[in-house]
Amino acid sequence: MRNSLTMVGTFWAFLSLVTAVASSTSYFLPYWLFGSQLGKPVSFSTFRRCNYPVRGDGHNLIMVEECGRYASFTAIPSLAWQMCTVVTGAGCALLLLVALAAVLGCCMEELISRMMGRCMGAAQFVGGLLISAGCALYPLGWNSPEVMQTCGNVSNQFQLGTCRLGWAYYCAGGGAAAAMLICTWLSCFAGRNPKPVMLVENIMRNTNSYALELDHCLKP
């Protein structure tokens, strides 16, 4: 089955899918930051959290051991994490869109030309840059009261305190770096250059199709 990608392009499509899935999965999983509170493990992402304290009987704090997202966007602990949520989400969406188009290029002929591949590579660079910006913004929220309670009350911006970064944070950053550096470069060689004969055939086919449709419309 012919497709619109070269051998390098096929590898580019596969790597694009891997990086997009890795970054997007890491974005949704609440394993960016690990700490503890009231003797229970606690983990965060930008907009989700696992295990949180609530007031029990007698107004004592007890830990609810479950994962969930914050009730609203404004409930996210800090402005930096709110910005991180938006920026990283936009980057993941862009990488997923390019990955989907790249995979379709493996199955459809004449979908991705050499120029189109380079444009998609530029989009991947922007997507990776957005995710990288989100990862850079994330430490700015470590001084929020909610995070400080989890990190021994000694955390601050770019200071973890007793907490540690989780694997999802590294996975998101790694996926962004791969998209920016490797996928962007491979995209320059992904699409096939259309052959002149093929271009003429396509033009003639489209012209004949339009002529038939016009003739059909003009008939009484």
UniProtKB/Swiss-Prot annotation:
PANTHER family assigned: LHFPL TETRASPAN SUBFAMILY MEMBER 1 PROTEIN, LIPOMA HMGIC FUSION PARTNER-LIKE PROTEIN
Pfam families: L_HMGIC_fpl
UniProt subcellular location: Membrane
The gene coding this protein: Lhfpl1
Secretion signal span: 1-20
InterPro entries xref list: LHFPL (IPR019372)
Domain of life: Eukaryota
Protein name (database record): LHFPL tetraspan subfamily member 1 protein
Transmembrane segments: 86-106, 122-142, 165-185
Species for this entry: Mus musculus (Mouse)
Keywords: Glycoprotein, Membrane, Signal, Transmembrane, Transmembrane helix
One GO CC term on file: membrane
Entry similarity comment: Belongs to the LHFP family.
Mode of membrane association: Multi-pass membrane protein
Expression tissues: Widely expressed. Strongly expressed in vagina and ovary. Weakly expressed in spleen, kidney, thymus, testis, brain, lung, intestine and uterus.
UniProt keyword Disulfide bond, yes or no: no
Main localization of the protein described in the UniProt heading: membrane
List of glycosylated residues: N153
